[in-house]
UniProtKB/Swiss-Prot annotation:
Signal sequence coordinates: none
Annotated SUPFAM superfamilies: Class I glutamine amidotransferase-like, P-loop containing nucleoside triphosphate hydrolases
Residues at the active site: C330, H440
GO biological process: cobalamin biosynthetic process
Protein name: Cobyric acid synthase
Organism listed in the record: Ruminiclostridium cellulolyticum (strain ATCC 35319 / DSM 5812 / JCM 6584 / H10) (Clostridium cellulolyticum)
């Protein structure tokens, strides 16, 4: 059976996901069989495994760092918010329905056996399990039915390291307050703290670290600097969205929908050296981009209504009327249609007018499509005609289908897909310079990136030599190794290994982590 180590954080975005990924890579480099585990993740960023199961992207990253194929056992429960008060509940990789917060808390005790089975199964195949907590472990109103933080640590007898984000301020208060709010049986699990996202001279910080240790009787395992590694990380979402910089020769605007999902679709675009990728949420931010992308959404009708009310829909239509390209992915593709129907109340229920840029209709259904695909672009028209015949890989996660309207002669399918099952089907639609697809990950292909860059540069009268940008797999491996190297420099790994070996019975909390 595997030995556990758990990373908790004083708050959301404290850096738990990245620290977990880094430890997974370190332990793997050191020759151990390693797997990540997060009992419950709440995120709009998800991934489809080879067997069609859906799981959180953070655990996919951690699995890759551990050299493992993503496995839904690593994230048995995924909550995908559909509104301010409700989420779609994914259990064991499959949706079991939408629930309000109240309904979920009434139901969650039924989920505990699924968590135990998933963990025990992983434990039999690995030497170390790196567990990630969720949010803050000191939410005293949620302790009774907790199975994501200290409730899980107690169930699995896991030692805990608690991370605090010093970049946002108040790290000593948050670490002290978190530990002091723990019950006595919870405190015995806490074997160290980590100061995360530090900028500056550690020497100036040391007096505070000593005082913190004296107050909570828990050692500081390390001070982690603000790391600049390019890893698909839930915690970096707000930073990615707010990043400002000069416009590139190519200006790509991604609409920052309120319920944007699978934002990792656009990470690869940031590797086009002559391009800038901006996330915009208002007409005052849109400007005059060369390409507008409407991303996936967990609530297509709600986010279309939001765009309609804030004026972005009109701006996108004007952009398309100038024969400038618009690309919709999944929910964004659905918004481009003439009509949207929701006969089963999957989202809002009823019918809604779409943007009308593609002559098609979307109908939401109860069953969710979840599959990995291989695709080949059809004969593509418009600015991106160079994509014709190019191949790609990706995955589908959506409710319902989109069909061309009767008598429509102007639009055609964008690509042909082959599912893992062997089933083949057309996907997406195109008309002029408006394109839509259900496939996530369509840009994660070097040849496709080069074609898109060349087309946009040519449209502006600029020369562009098609070339290789990067090998995505090799690039990710390099980033995971950089993360591991950085953590080895600043964490007391000898102490962490000792904690893993001795578990919660370890009473000698001596470390020189800073």
């Amino acid at each position: 059976m595997a030995k556990p180590i758990m990373i908790q954080g004083t708050m959301s975005n404290a850096g738990k996901s990245l620290l977990t990924a880094g430890l997974c890579r370190i332990f793997t480099q050191d020759g151990y069989r390693v797997a990540p585990f997060k009992s419950q993740n709440m995120a709009l960023n998800s991934y489809i495994t080879t067997d069609g199961s859906e799981m959180g992207r953070a655990q996919v990253v951690q699995a890759e760092a551990a050299g493992k194929a993503p496995d839904v056992r690593m994230n048995p429960i995924l909550l995908k918010p559909t509104s301010e008060k409700g989420s779609q509940v994914i259990l064991g990789g499959k949706p079991i329905g939408n629930m309000t917060t109240t309904e979920y808390y009434a139901h969650k005790h039924n989920l505990l056996p699924h968590i135990k089975r998933a963990y025990e199964s992983l434990s039999q195949e690995n030497d170390i399990i790196v567990i990630e907590g969720a949010g803050s472990p000191a939410e005293i109103n949620l302790k009774r039915d907790d199975f994501v933080n200290m409730g899980l640590a107690k169930m699995l007898k896991a030692p805990v390291l608690i991370a605090g984000d010093i970049d946002r301020g108040g790290v000593f208060a948050s670490l002290y307050g978190t530990v002091m709010l723990f019950d006595e049986d919870e405190r015995k699990h806490v074997k160290g703290t980590i100061i995360n996202k530090f900028r500056g001279d550690v020497e100036i910080l040391k007096p505070g670290l000593d005082m913190l240790c004296d107050l909570i009787h828990v050692p500081v395992v390390g001070v982690v600097p603000y790391l600049h590694v390019d890893i698909d990380d839930e915690d970096s979402l707000s930073e990615r969205f707010s990043k400002k910089g000069p416009l590139g020769l190519i200006d790509i605007a991604v609409i920052k929908l309120p319920r944007i999902s699978n934002f990792t679709d656009f990470n690869a675009l940031e590797h086009i050296e002559c391009a800038s990728v901006r996330y915009v949420s208002g007409t005052n931010e849109l400007g005059n981009p060369d390409l507008i992308i409407i991303p996936g959404s967990k609530n297509t009708m709600g986010d279309l209504k939001w765009m309609r009310e804030n004026g972005l829909e009109v701006c996108i239509k004007k952009h398309a009327a100038k024969n400038k390209p618009v690309f919709g992915i999944c929910g964004g593709y659905q918004m481009l249609c003439e009509n949207l129907g929701d006969p089963y109340g999957v989202e809002h229920g009823g019918e809604m007018k779409g943007m009308g840029l593609l002559k098609s209709t979307t109908v939401f259904e109860k069953e969710k499509t979840r599959t990995r695909v291989m695709g080949t672009f059809s004969k593509v028209g418009g600015i991106f005609n160079g994509l014709s015949g190019k191949t790609f890989e990706g995955y589908e996660i959506h409710m319902g289908y989109t069909a061309s309207e009767e008598g429509n002669e102007g639009d055609s399918s964008l690509s042909n897909l082959a599912e893992i099952s062997g089933n083949e089907k057309p996907d997406g639609m195109q008309k002029g310079n408006v394109y839509g697809t259900y496939v996530h990950g369509v840009f994660d292909n070097d040849e496709i990136l080069s074609e898109i860059a060349a087309a946009l540069m040519k449209e502006k009268g600029l020369e562009y030599e098609k070339h290789t940008f990067f090998n995505l797999k090799e690039y990710k491996e390099k980033q995971y190794n950089l993360l591991a190297d950085a953590l080895r420099e600043c964490l007391d790994m000898e102490y962490i290994y000792k904690v893993i070996e001795e578990g919660i019975e370890n009473g000698n909390n001596e470390t020189n982590g800073y």
